[in-house]
Amino acid sequence: MRLTLPRLNAAYIVGAARTPVGKFNGALKSVSAIDLGITAAKAAVQRSKVPADQIDEFLFGQVLTANSGQAPARQVVIKGGFPESVEATTINKVCSSGLKTVALAAQAIKAGDRNVIVAGGMESMSNTPYYSGRGLVFGNQKLEDSIVKDGLWDPYNNIHMGNCCENTNKRDGITREQQDEYAIESYRRANESIKNGAFKDEIVPVEIKTRKGTVTVSEDEEPKGANAEKLKGLKPVFDKQGSVTAGNASPINDGASAVVVASGTKAKELGTPVLAKIVSYADAATAPIDFTIAPSLAIPAALKKAGLTKDDIALWEINEAFSGVALANLMRLGIDKSKVNVKGGAVALGHPIGASGNRIFVTLVNALKEGEYGVAAICNGGGASTAIVIKKVSSVE
């Protein structure tokens, strides 16, 4: 007897929103990761026009969950006013977390397990605590920064993520000048995008209540005040003889982002707007010290699944954990840098680690034109990466 397998459901993006990205201890420092996630999720759902009772699950990425409370993704659901019947799962794939949620949402929809999923990422690096060990009886106690411990430290080689990038730069011959020039261009693109309102369709303002009234944050905070000459004069951070500086690396930030992923059948049934179709996705891994080049492995895998080549791709979003990361992957993939991070990247806009994968995805969805293909990819600690291929469409295919 021959079995007939059911046709897989196609997954579509029907809503997308992100908060502005705040500086470390900046405009968003008083807002928790949960509240940032709620802001992004509510806006994405509102824009999708999907009734809240039609949502099956929330998948939310967060890396620095310490002191956020139990089940952060579930808190976004309950505190956000969504039905208690909506399931929720928190995802930690380090910096890939927010993009992995989109891939997992697409998988569940293709399998027929879910019809509508809110996939996002959130991080408040300004609100992360310090750790102290238990059982102190007498004497001094050392504190550990949870940002470094759980987010920015390679536990396999016992070095900072920045040292991994230094290793890549030396091996690939990437110079300090190349990294600085790349960073300066990222800042230029970001500031130009802010000035021209290029982010207005993706950003939802964050309202902060203070004793003096309500403060509204509506623009990315990090790019403002960038100075090319000062950037070129900064000293290396991780290796005195190295080339990675605070200026050509991504900063520490706060922010959240979310998309609503729906099956084509459900999107038609609900009459939702359609923003893009998820074509394929892939993960790839290599040695932990080489996490920097992992996107160059995940991207070809995703393209192969889509039946596409790099020449079919109109725009790329490759997360700029460091300028050296972007340069190393562009070199390996042979991509035209004029098509990469056209609105500026994480070096300029910021890198709230649990949210960044979703942020670049939302930016890509908004940047593409009808019928164009785009790729979003991001590396993560441990030597891995996630990549997603999408097609810009305005209706279910």
Curated annotation (Swiss-Prot):
The keyword Nucleotide-binding does not apply. It catalyses: 2 acetyl-CoA = acetoacetyl-CoA + CoA. The active site is at residues 95, 351, 379. Pfam families: Thiolase_C, Thiolase_N. It comes from the Eukaryota. The keyword Lipid biosynthesis does not apply. CDD domains: thiolase (cd00751). It is found in: Peroxisome. K(+) binds at residues 187, 246-247, 249, 347. Its main location: other. CoA binds at residues 187, 230, 250. Essential for n-decane utilization. PANTHER family: ACETYL-COA ACETYLTRANSFERASE, MITOCHONDRIAL, ACETYL-COA C-ACYLTRANSFERASE. This is Acetyl-CoA acetyltransferase. It comes from Yarrowia lipolytica (strain CLIB 122 / E 150). The gene is PAT1.
